[in-house]
């Protein structure tokens, strides 16, 4: 998103406190340890999964995280599937890296995954999902998530699961792809 709200006073006060304290220089490239530890603890508390602090990388935003993830996982010419409609940054970043984008469209009359359709895409290097979906808000069921995870594992396809909007599903408790295994 692109929020237009003002910076809260609490944040401004903390920045001023740190500047007065004389903290200068760069943070570690993967983020400060206390923050990475808190995120690891959050995954344990929220999803009951162990995520080592070493697997957590802090970025300046989601697009930076996607760029790093794509650079780490894919090479020029790889084929990566996205489920439409989709957050445009996925497509744009992948194309800028000369990665072939394979667009999977849902059945126009359904809001669920057509498993038979997906079986046609075994020759992929990667799959990117957004849950809940950005922009339409569609939420994958546990069955759908598990299917996608197992499909990718079976065919050795790298899976990137964008779960940034998990906190705004109101009455739904969503699972992370990590609930089905560590290969995501």
Report each predicted region and the residues it spans:
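Active-site PLP attachment segment
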Residues: 176-184
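Short glycine-rich anion-binding loops that position phosphate/pyrophosphate groups of nucleotides
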Residues: 3, 63, 131-135
């Amino acid at each position: 998103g692109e929020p237009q709200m003002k910076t809260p006073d609490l944040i401004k006060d903390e920045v001023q406190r740190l500047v007065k304290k004389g903290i200068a220089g760069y943070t570690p490239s993967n983020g400060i340890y206390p923050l990475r530890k808190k995120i690891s603890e959050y995954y344990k508390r929220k999803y009951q999964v162990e995520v080592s602090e070493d697997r957590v990388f802090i970025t300046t935003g989601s697009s930076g995280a996607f760029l790093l993830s794509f650079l780490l996982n894919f090479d020029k010419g790889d084929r990566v599937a996205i489920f439409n409609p989709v957050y445009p940054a996925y497509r744009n970043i992948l194309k800028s890296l000369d990665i072939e984008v394979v667009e999977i469209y849902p059945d126009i009359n359904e809001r669920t995954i057509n498993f038979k359709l997906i079986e046609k895409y075994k020759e992929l290097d990667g799959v990117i999902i957004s849950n809940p979906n950005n922009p339409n808000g569609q939420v994958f069921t546990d069955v759908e998530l598990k299917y996608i995870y197992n499909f990718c594992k079976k065919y050795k396809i790298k899976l990137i699961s964008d779960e940034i909007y998990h906190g705004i599903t109101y009455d739904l408790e969503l699972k992370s792809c990590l609930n089905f295994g560590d290969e995501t």
